[in-house]
């Protein structure tokens, strides 16, 4: 079992680039930078794409340029074109239920109210069985404040924790493709940025 497509969820445009909701895209941006494979806009995939070699595997990167709640359009377009199955897709997204500094891998499950995940599940034929990288951003403590929170920028101290977790997740993704998901998961799930 391998990963052929890594997706970083985001809202498009400079005004959203530094917001918590774009944490998934920060991870894909980091992978692209590390592998000197700049993301380029490809309209047929409704996003920015690139290709990298990860532990000997050919992996495509995607950051949709649709708004978050239409992310599935981009993911389905690329998965269909390259004949990539849902269980060969890793979707990185911001996670309210994890604190900043923590990231976790997960296979399948619901969307937990995340509109990007909701649309991807729908556009993959109601198939939730893709991998996720949950990037912790914390929770504002009141569900009525969630929208403003995810569309806000984290303070510098939280940003550093999120960046450190994203950095560790990128390392663990390479471990996954080289040594298997169990080893990668054990390492990532033991990590907490200080």
UniProtKB/Swiss-Prot annotation:
Top-level taxon in the UniProt lineage: Bacteria
Keyword annotations from UniProtKB, A to Z: Cytoplasm, Hydrolase, RNA-binding, tRNA-binding
Enzyme Commission number(s) of this protein: 3.1.1.29
A Pfam family per the record: Pept_tRNA_hydro
Residues of the site described as Stabilizes the basic form of H active site to accept a proton: 94
Annotated GO biological process: protein quality control for misfolded or incompletely synthesized proteins; rescue of stalled ribosome
Ligand binding (tRNA): 16, 67, 69, 115
InterPro entries: Pept_tRNA_hydro, Pept_tRNA_hydro_CS, Pept_tRNA_hydro_sf
PROSITE patterns found in the cross-reference section: PEPT_TRNA_HYDROL_1, PEPT_TRNA_HYDROL_2
Enzyme class: hydrolase
Catalytic residues identified in the record: 21
Predominant location category: cytoplasm
Compartments where found: Cytoplasm
Entry's Gene Ontology cellular component terms: cytoplasm
Catalytic activity: an N-acyl-L-alpha-aminoacyl-tRNA + H2O = an N-acyl-L-amino acid + a tRNA + H(+)
CDD domains xrefs: PTH
Subunit composition and interactions: Monomer.
Role, per record: Hydrolyzes ribosome-free peptidyl-tRNAs (with 1 or more amino acids incorporated), which drop off the ribosome during protein synthesis, or as a result of ribosome stalling. Catalyzes the release of premature peptidyl moieties from peptidyl-tRNA molecules trapped in stalled 50S ribosomal subunits, and thus maintains levels of free tRNAs and 50S ribosomes.
Name used for this protein in its record: Peptidyl-tRNA hydrolase
Species, as recorded: Klebsiella pneumoniae subsp. pneumoniae (strain ATCC 700721 / MGH 78578)
